A protein has these predicted regions:
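Donor-binding/catalytic cores of nucleotide-activated saccharide
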Residues: 1-79, 86-103, 123
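Short, charged, amphipathic alpha-helical segments
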Residues: 127-134, 157-161
Length: 197
């Protein structure tokens, strides 16, 4: 797709070739935010795949990832096509880009619901679980940038990040993550958090 921020157009292509995925591969890709699969945009779903799955109205963040995780149970085949099919406009002043004092709580709730789903449906599958922990660690890094170090955060310091890293769900994700499917800069940051917080 084309991502448009103000007047700048950036073509986003996560993979160059067409690819076919089974249910597990789709779920693993959905749990890795840097693949782009966890978002609900960029997709066309067969109505039978969606079935009775709906967005969780109790979540304010992460509801799209949970939706993708839940429909993965109904997927027999997913096909990726590396073509620009639409324009995705980014609103730089949107609500998700503003400082939110409840940011950590919103992500914690989403992580708790995600964990419950993954453990109930894939608790014995190590490959799924490690990707879930990587998903959690990735979101701790988002919290570090968008909350702990946000210019409007009055607690803006390492203490804020330490508090976040000591929340059990986040601590577990950091500890059990394996650096897979994240960029080098995020790997370095995650390594620092794992060994210094």
């Amino acid at each position: 797709y084309n991502r448009i921020v103000w007047n700048n157009i950036e073509y986003i292509n996560f993979k160059k070739d067409e690819s076919e995925f089974n249910s597990e591969e789709y779920l693993i890709n959905s749990l890795n935010p840097q693949t782009g699969f966890g978002f609900c945009h960029m997709k066309l779903f067969n109505k039978k795949t969606i079935n009775n799955v709906r967005f969780n109205q109790k979540l304010q963040v992460g509801e799209d990832a949970l939706f993708n995780e839940e429909i993965s149970l109904n997927i027999t085949k997913a096909i990726y096509i590396g073509k620009q099919l639409y324009n995705y406009r980014v609103n730089e002043k949107s609500v998700v880009r503003k400082f939110d004092a409840n940011y950590v709580d919103k992500y914690l709730k989403a992580i708790q619901v995600n964990k419950m789903f993954v453990m109930q449906n894939y608790g014995e599958e190590q490959n799924i679980k490690i990707n879930y922990y990587n998903y959690v660690a990735y979101h701790v890094l988002l919290i570090a940038v968008n909350y702990c170090n946000h210019a409007e955060n009055i607690e803006k310091n390492n203490d804020s990040l330490k508090k976040v890293c000591n929340i059990e769900e986040f601590k577990e994700g950091i500890r059990k993550s394996n650096y897979k499917n994240i960029s080098l800069t995020r790997k370095i940051t995650l390594f620092t958090i794992k060994h210094k917080m």
